Amino acid sequence: MKVSVVVPVRDEERSIRELLDSLLTQTRPPDEIVITDGGSTDATPQIIEEYIHNGAPVRLIRAGAALPGRGRNLGAAQASHEWLGFTDAGIRLENNWLEALVAKAEADENVDVVYGSWQPVTDTFFKQCAAIAYVPPPTSHGGIITRPRFIASTLLRREAWQAVNGFPEELRSAEDLIFMDRVENAGYRFVFEPRAQVHWDLRPTLWSTFKRFVVYSRNNIRAGLFRQWQATVLFKYYGVLAVLLAAVLIFKPSLVWFPIAAWLLLLTARAAVAIRRNRFCYPASLLQNLARGAMVMPLIAVLDAAAILGSIQWLLLDCFRWSRKTPVEAGNGA
C-alpha cells in the first residue's frame, strides 16, 4: 500500500517545520506529502521549498486564495497514490500515527476509511480550561476509548473521496464534517484506530478563542448545522434570559439585577457541569476545580458571544444567498 498525505496550509511558518519533521520521521513514512498553500503571506512556502530542495518527498501546490476544503481537494486530485492520508498544520503527530492507520487498513480489505484518535494540547492552565469548556471528552464503546471523527487523523481510499466529489470548498470550517457524513452515507466502511494519535493545539487566549469561534459559528450555519450548537445557545439559554429581562424592564425595573444574577448562575452551573464531565480526563482537587471554574465561566461566555456574533454575520452576509442553495451545493461553489 502506498500513501499520499495531503495537508492544506496558510500562514503556518511557526508550525510547518514541526509537522514536516514529524511526517518524515514516522515509523512508516508517507510515500508522498502533498501540501497545498492557500495564499500564505508569510514564509510558509519558502520553508516547504527548503525541504523539497533537500530531497524530501514533498510536493507544493500554490493554490492562491483557497480555504481548507479546496486545499484538500487540489492536493488529493494531484496525489499519486490510491490511499490518501489527511492532517493539518498545527497538529502534532505521534511517531506511529501513519503506521497504525495503514496497519488497520491492510488488516481488512473491505475497509475504506480509517480514522484515528486525537488529544487537545493542555500545556497551560488556560488551555486545560478551554478543553474543559468546549472539547468533548472521550467516550467508551466496548471498552475502547473513542473520540469524534477528525479529518486531521484520517486515511481513506481515493475512491471514497471521488465518490462524493470531495470536500465542500466555500466553508472555512465544518467542511470536514460534511465530507465525512457524505462518505458514510455513500456506503463506505469506517473503522477506528485508537493507536493513531495526533495532538491538537488549542487557542491560547480568550481573544483568539473568540475570533476562531466566530468563524466556526458562521460556517456552522452555512453547513446546515445550526441545531447542533447555536440553537441551544440562542433559544435555550439567551432566549429565556431575554424574555426574563424584558418582563422585568416592563413590570419591575428595580429588579433589573435579577436577569444578570440568573445569567451568572447559569454560567456557574454550566461550568460545574463541564468540569464534572471532564473529571476523569483532568482530575483535580476541589481548590483546583474552583480555580478552573473561575476561568471556564468566562470561556463559556466568550463561546456564547461568538455563537451569537457568528449567527448575526450569517444573517447579514449569507442568509439570502445561502437560502438558494443546499449546504453541500453551497459548500462546493455550485
Task: Please give the residue ranges for each predicted region.
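Acidic donor-binding/catalytic loop of UDP-sugar-dependent glycosyltransferases
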Residues: 43, 89-104, 181
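Short aromatic/hydrophobic "clamp" motif used to bind/position activated sugar donors
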Residues: 84
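Catalytic donor/gating beta->alpha subdomain of glycosyltransferases that bind UDP-sugars
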Residues: 168-228
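Glycine-rich, basic loop-to-helix element that forms the pyrophosphate-binding segment
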Residues: 63-79
